[in-house]
């Protein structure tokens, strides 16, 4: 009986881990931030990163999912 309960508990834990991993793999849509997970943009998109400056001082890097083969230029 103890073995059966232990096996059921292990299966539940494994299932929860798999569900959590699937949620982390969910793709990031267009124009959403991908700084922490650059490989998770939806198909047809790429994670493009920019270094942000405020008054000449670097304030970190931010990344966004954008369309592949699209180039953005400053105005």
Curated annotation (Swiss-Prot):
A Pfam match: Toxin_35
Tissues/organs with expression: Expressed by the venom gland.
One cellular-component annotation, GO: extracellular region
Protein name listed in UniProt: U6-lycotoxin-Ls1c
InterPro entries named in the record: Spider_toxin_CSTX_knottin
Signal sequence range: 1-21
Disulfide cysteine pairs (residue numbers): 27-42, 34-47, 41-65, 49-63
Residue ranges listed under propeptide: 22-25
Keyword Disulfide bond among UniProt keywords: yes
GO molecular function: toxin activity
Keywords, sorted A to Z: Disulfide bond, Secreted, Signal, Toxin
Protein family per UniProt: Belongs to the neurotoxin 19 (CSTX) family. 06 (U6-Lctx) subfamily.
Domain-level remarks: The presence of a 'disulfide through disulfide knot' structurally defines this protein as a knottin.
Protein localization: Secreted
Entry superkingdom: Eukaryota
Positions of transmembrane segments: none
